[in-house]
């Protein structure tokens, strides 16, 4: 029983973000479709080779995507919304981009599909749309073409396919309502056809991803698995693959399925290996997800070995990453600026492949010397002075309930704020960032590289802030922002100014489409050595008589969008960040900033996957926000912003944040999200996003007015704000000016009645 290793997927974007650059060049009309496709082929070949060289036995194929893998699955199944279809019914890469972005180099622009978070990660997928009576057929053969590519290169491959039940679970019904699970029998023939094609190619194992099996699914959905997999059995061996949580609660459903193996996430789940071994059919293969695919820490391989060694030789066993390595940066070896001690604590995707090779070899041979050597730095870290700050730990221990309470209730605060700001009805604002032009990015890059001194850098940033204020005044916005020209990323910027974080040069991970983020890494206790945002906020406010918002990223979002420590709880990290940012709120207020926005777009994304675990998380998540905000005086207006959210199931917690104003992303869901606020009778002010900033399309005045009127049927007009869905960082100035001008005009029309 030789033990093999495999990964569930590999980062797609390339070490230098080659995919991002190729996509954006193609979208801008600067390169051809053939050139784009060639970059994809080159990246896939390189990534398969890198994994193979690092010691991976079975290479994933089908993990590559031009936008996201759920959208790839939609095209595979022929699920293309009518508004995105080609006139001749064909499907091509531009069809895919129209669904994701709303437009492509060919075809007519149309509203992009809704985008939401992939389980509890910071990766996004395009939500499949289902309509009654829908037909499915094998349409987009990318998976088969990539399998042919890999086989031609001589690789031993394991195709990756998103499973049918999870695919339906992730989608939404459009138009006339019906049970989307009823489409299962319609999509299964396409899956059968794909598996038959893979069998023809001599494929032995297919990784079929069913991460929905870690959720607390309704019984009807659990019951759907058996007939679904009865229909799919027999053509190839199926490795039923789960991740992000354990499977024990749904193990009875799983063990009844006609599959040949099961992958479990032994990092994020609480499954007991001995229990799994006992309950799984004896002829099943167990794929043990022992190496964390979602973090950057070097594994203690001696611990991983101990976790699995008792079942070695007792059943077929593979060792694997816990989930796809998509969520990890590619290669630690190119990081030249990290301190040597700190660098020795990390492992990126390629190093994780090496860890899997070390683990496989030790399990096959029984020789653990290499594991002990590899694990030494991470064991030494536990005693490092870089990790522990007694002053932070003492302050955290001293927190009382009073520290998370504003002085007065919303009604009292709202009166003080109305008297201070005297805003019109339907007040207009933006979410914070303005277009990050080439000039802004070049300015920051030159400063970072040492090609520009601090004085010239500050002069340049000040000029961009001034331009942003002038633009907003010209447009007639009521509450302004400074535009965030000095910020590379809403989390990275704060991490750079807080102790306890480190940064990489090339630690990029994909967020969606061509968007990549470079998450900070929390390595120790968090504190704020000096004010972070005060100087630029104060400067922006000096340029205008209108209020300028101070802009902070909230503690839960900084936590969720960073790679966290693994030696303390997430709650501890969030509250340490909250205390650091509490001091920032006090300093902004002292500098005359009267409106302070604390963005928490990730609050819902941080939810545990099982609802039974939600309360504990929401309790400390809300408390962290309140610790951050509660230092503000009554006439200081606290805003928060959230995006890509389903709110109805956490409305109590959103109300408990006690923000004076919440801005939310609603345009893609056609104001659907406001239902939750209406039903809950949300007491504070709301800015429902009136246009989708992820698409370059400019909304008309009439469109925005119609959305606002729809919103006013649910929320009293005197409590409504007018704003875009999200920050405008990724847009160009021409469409930004046009969209905001229409937004301001719509608000003015409504004021006139």
Curated annotation (Swiss-Prot):
Domain of life, per lineage: Bacteria
Alphabetical list of InterPro entries matching this protein: Cbl-indep_Met_Synth_N (IPR013215), Cobalamin-indep_Met_synthase (IPR006276), Met_Synth_C/arc (IPR002629), UROD/MetE-like_sf (IPR038071)
GO biological process, one term: methionine biosynthetic process
Cofactor: Zn(2+)
Documented EC number(s): 2.1.1.14
Catalytic activity, reaction form: 5-methyltetrahydropteroyltri-L-glutamate + L-homocysteine = tetrahydropteroyltri-L-glutamate + L-methionine
Binding of Zn(2+), residues: 641, 643, 665, 726
Keyword list, A-Z: Amino-acid biosynthesis, Metal-binding, Methionine biosynthesis, Methyltransferase, Repeat, Transferase, Zinc
Residues annotated as binding L-methionine: 431-433, 484, 599
Binding site for L-homocysteine: 431-433, 484, 599
Any one GO molecular function term: 5-methyltetrahydropteroyltriglutamate-homocysteine S-methyltransferase activity
Active site residues of this protein: 694
Cofactor detail note: Binds 1 zinc ion per subunit.
Protein residues bound to 5-methyltetrahydropteroyltri-L-glutamate: 17-20, 117, 515-516, 561, 605
Pathway(s) served: Amino-acid biosynthesis; L-methionine biosynthesis via de novo pathway; L-methionine from L-homocysteine (MetE route): step 1/1
Pfam family, one: Meth_synt_1
Biological role stated in the UniProt entry: Catalyzes the transfer of a methyl group from 5-methyltetrahydrofolate to homocysteine resulting in methionine formation.
Family recorded in the similarity comment: Belongs to the vitamin-B12 independent methionine synthase family.
The protein's name: 5-methyltetrahydropteroyltriglutamate--homocysteine methyltransferase
Species the sequence originates in: Escherichia fergusonii (strain ATCC 35469 / DSM 13698 / CCUG 18766 / IAM 14443 / JCM 21226 / LMG 7866 / NBRC 102419 / NCTC 12128 / CDC 0568-73)
Lineage per the UniProt record: Bacteria, Pseudomonadati, Pseudomonadota, Gammaproteobacteria, Enterobacterales
